[in-house]
Amino acid sequence: MLTYPQIDPVALAVGPLKIHWYGLMYLIGIGGAWLLASRRMKRFDPTWTKERLSDLVFWVACGVILGGRLGYVLFYNLDEYIANPTLIFEVWKGGMSFHGGLLGVMLAVWWFGKRHGKSFFQLMDFIAPLVPIGLGAGRIGNFINSELWGKVSDVPWAMVFPNGGPLPRHPSQLYQFALEGVALFVILWLFTRKPRPTASVSGLFVLCYGIFRFVVEFVRVPDAQLGYLAWGWLTMGQVLCVPMVLAGIALMVWAYRRDAAQPKAA
């Protein structure tokens, strides 16, 4: 059994102002994505400037935060937030939904593309390899917050979490960091080393994320207010991942068939 590191959720406090690690992880994720995007920008569109990239990152970040929070409210804990709406604004306590964040990003990208003459999937393919940075940082934030831990386990790396009772548990946040953050980043980065059909990168992203998240949900404790939805193992996270996997497969098939059907230059 490993010892859970006692980390103060507050990274920095200046008087009444407190900066939480959870929020700081979002800033790290957004900043890291911007740095990598600035390196890939000219390959994506030689006419783009740092200002336009910053504009895109800003709106995507808004989509992540607003969509992620509203997604958690709608998918995971609607009754509590209806009873006490002010809790919606307490984001430093956690409570973000990836699936809601993805929908928020999709809306932001659609709107940005309409303004700047880029198709939805052109922009999504550009953004997708950057997203694992934020996902990985967010899972570290979950770990520091001692939330979203896994089921009781006797594996050698199990931990006793401050909010998880006296028994050791799977550090499922670290599993998600390794899969959604590290593995997904490597897969997408290798896949995009050469030109790919439009929408195929987006398809690979949602396919891999859906598979990784579905698998980790087997060892992650579901939200207490929801529990298991069916058969003693099906979680809301898994329900939301099924359409992602199907959409990812469909997108990749469509992208490659569409590319094959287009006339090639002589």
UniProtKB/Swiss-Prot annotation:
Q: Which PROSITE patterns does the protein's record reference? A: LGT
Give the transmembrane region(s). 17-37, 56-76, 92-112, 120-140, 171-191, 199-219, 233-253
For this record, the Gene Ontology CC terms, alphabetical, are: plasma membrane
Q: Which residues bind a 1,2-diacyl-sn-glycero-3-phospho-(1'-sn-glycerol)?
A: R139
| E.C. no | 2.5.1.145
Q: Which GO terms describe its biological process?
A: lipoprotein biosynthetic process
Report the membrane topology from the UniProt record: Multi-pass membrane protein
Annotated InterPro entries: Lgt (IPR001640)
Alphabetically list the UniProt keywords. Answer: Cell inner membrane, Cell membrane, Membrane, Transferase, Transmembrane, Transmembrane helix
Gene Ontology terms for molecular function: phosphatidylglycerol-prolipoprotein diacylglyceryl transferase activity
Q: Which domain of life is it from?
A: Bacteria
Which cell locations does it reside in? Cell inner membrane
List the pathway annotation: Protein modification; lipoprotein biosynthesis (diacylglyceryl transfer)
The UniProt entry, under HAMAP family, shows: Lgt
Free-text function comment from the UniProt entry: Catalyzes the transfer of the diacylglyceryl group from phosphatidylglycerol to the sulfhydryl group of the N-terminal cysteine of a prolipoprotein, the first step in the formation of mature lipoproteins.
Q: State the similarity comment.
A: Belongs to the Lgt family.
Q: What is this protein called?
A: Phosphatidylglycerol--prolipoprotein diacylglyceryl transferase
Q: Give the originating organism.
A: Pseudomonas aeruginosa (strain UCBPP-PA14)
